Amino acid sequence: MASLSEFVSEPISMMSQTSAASESQCYYNETIAFFYNRSGKYLATEWNAVSKLVMGLGITVCIFIMLANLLVMVAIYVNRRFHFPIYYLMANLAAADFFAGLAYFYLMFNTGPNTRRLTVSTWLLRQGLIDTSLTASVANLLAIAIERHITVFRMQLHTRMSNRRVVVVIVVIWTVAIVMGAIPSVGWNCICDLEQCSNMAPLYSDSYLIFWTIFNLVTFVVMVVLYAHIFVYVRQKTMRMSRHSSGPRRNRDTMMSLLKTVVIVLGAFIVCWTPGLVLLLLDICCPQCNILAYEKFFLLLAEFNSAMNPIIYSYRDKEMSATFKQILCCQRTENVNGPTEGSDRSASSLNHTILAGVHSNDHSVV
């Protein structure tokens, strides 16, 4: 007859074996090649002409991204006409794009054959930096959309958001971005469940990619709805102004020009990032689709987006363009270093012109 100690020791032994088996299912010590080979994603062994060209182009674009967005941040800092909450948020968007440039710069030196040298931790860091930069950009664009919506519909000449609140918003944006980028590193990955591994991102779990992709796409939709609401409101006010106001047409043209600038910035972001996010969903929902053939193209498209905003500002905003030239030419003028007469009126903010037209319209109707 078995003794009591045998009955007790047998379950304990089984539990320890189960625990050991469970631990053996995690592959933290495996090479990156192990995950890539299992997912079927190609992992280069040597540099070819195309890889060198892509790396050279990528590094060049990264340097331009960082310098151009640094120029935007400096321009907003030195020109007091830009010292409004909306421009602080735009500066933070430039900071997010600057961070994206750093993330892509790190990626360029750890891609191709160099990917094989990465550990699980450094691979997750590489991807986490890109995820953080995207989340920061999305959250910042959403904050700008909400600020514009509130300001326009409350008919305020200047937003009542204090500088302290702007700082709080910026801190929240970066906190959310860092958390979203760090989630896979702290456990939401497929290292312990290889069946859930993605083909495009071999160490990421499908469930996390679904969550991350849908989160960003829903945010895109919310921003589009907010700006569409603003656009309809502005168009209605413009029509009323044209019927009842004898004010100059220049104000209305400026108003629509500023609205177009905002829409172009948002539109460029959505156009550059949506294809890549949809590709992630196809990777999960359509395993037979050859989505890996298009991965690098969409990644490059997303990278170019971080360089677009400074170009858009330079082309669409004369004040910003003039400030860029003064900085690059090392000029110091009264216009840049201090507010001039009527600088508040000339600050290129959408709601300034809207409200001028609205008040003029109300007076004419009365």
UniProtKB/Swiss-Prot annotation:
Residues 78-85, 147-165, 228-257, 318-366 are cytoplasmic. InterPro entries: GPCR_Rhodpsn, GPCR_Rhodpsn_7TM, LPA_rcpt, LPA_rcpt_EDG2. One of its GO terms (biological process) is regulation of metabolic process. Its main location: other. The chain crosses the membrane at residues 53-77, 86-109, 124-146, 166-186, 207-227, 258-282, 297-317. Residues 1-52, 110-123, 187-206, 283-296 are extracellular. It is found in: Cell surface; Cell membrane; Endosome. Signal peptide: none annotated. One of its GO terms (cellular component) is cell surface. GO terms for molecular function: lysophosphatidic acid receptor activity. Pfam families: 7tm_1. Glycans are attached at residues 29, 37. Disulfide bonds join 26-192, 190-197, 286-289. A 1-acyl-sn-glycero-3-phosphate binds at residues 41, 126-131, 212. It comes from the Eukaryota. Keywords: Cell membrane, Disulfide bond, Endosome, G-protein coupled receptor, Glycoprotein, Membrane, Receptor, Transducer, Transmembrane, Transmembrane helix. It is a multi-pass membrane protein. Expressed at high levels in oocytes and at lower levels in brain and spinal cord. Below detection level in lung, heart, kidney, liver, muscle, stomach, and intestine. PROSITE patterns: G_PROTEIN_RECEP_F1_1 (PS00237), G_PROTEIN_RECEP_F1_2 (PS50262). Receptor for lysophosphatidic acid (LPA). Plays a role in the reorganization of the actin cytoskeleton, cell migration, differentiation and proliferation, and thereby contributes to the responses to tissue damage and infectious agents. Activates downstream signaling cascades via the G(i)/G(o), G(12)/G(13), and G(q) families of heteromeric G proteins. Signaling inhibits adenylyl cyclase activity and decreases cellular cAMP levels. Signaling triggers an increase of cytoplasmic Ca(2+) levels. Belongs to the G-protein coupled receptor 1 family. This is Lysophosphatidic acid receptor 1-A. The lineage of its organism: Eukaryota, Metazoa, Chordata, Craniata, Vertebrata.
